[in-house]
């Protein structure tokens, strides 16, 4: 596991160097990000349901159940805990967002694939259906801080390319559709394999654009990081096991929860004219430290 994370971290470093040397950054990163989100990542999700042994359809409902439970409880955490982590009232919503949402779609799939194998990407995609819905409803409320505005949820999120690929993958597994021709599955697999290195290169390139001060963070950033990367995932791991969920489902859910802060936080802060300093810092710090904390968390799976 440590070797896997070191491999991923090495690709992040290559991205950082490429950003510093000018090979990456700016418009290139934006276009590559769009490619990953809208093409390679959906291909990875679909390929997870088309190659090798068909994923277990019996896990779909438990995955949706554990994900729904997770985000219901995390909603309470996001609205209650920030008041104890920051003295700035205006930052409570942003801190809550950082506590609640991990970078599932962009970093979660590559990490899950590296730890559990490509087939597990399908299970992570099922978990991400609830996560994506929550980001653009509860997440928007947290960032904007206005409970009275009914414009929070955008229906187009439900039929974005990543979500459509998740629906299709669930349909393939639920109906037991096997033996999909290689002329379809192999190109999807090859395109999907671009996701891991491309996503990590972009993360490294993004880090290369940040100042040293941002990389150091502050007390609120580090306390939020401890909850985001360690305390919350460990808490949910033991809670879900105690509730009798399948151990494989619990393990994948734990890794998904343990992802660094979702990049959507920065996007939403920009959209609603909120200060991006905290969300940028905590996204950076959690991304760096997750290279250490995720291998540590997987030790739980062997206990």
Language-model-detected regions and their locations in the chain:
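Alpha-helical transmembrane segments of multi-pass small-molecule/ion transporters
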Residues: 1-303
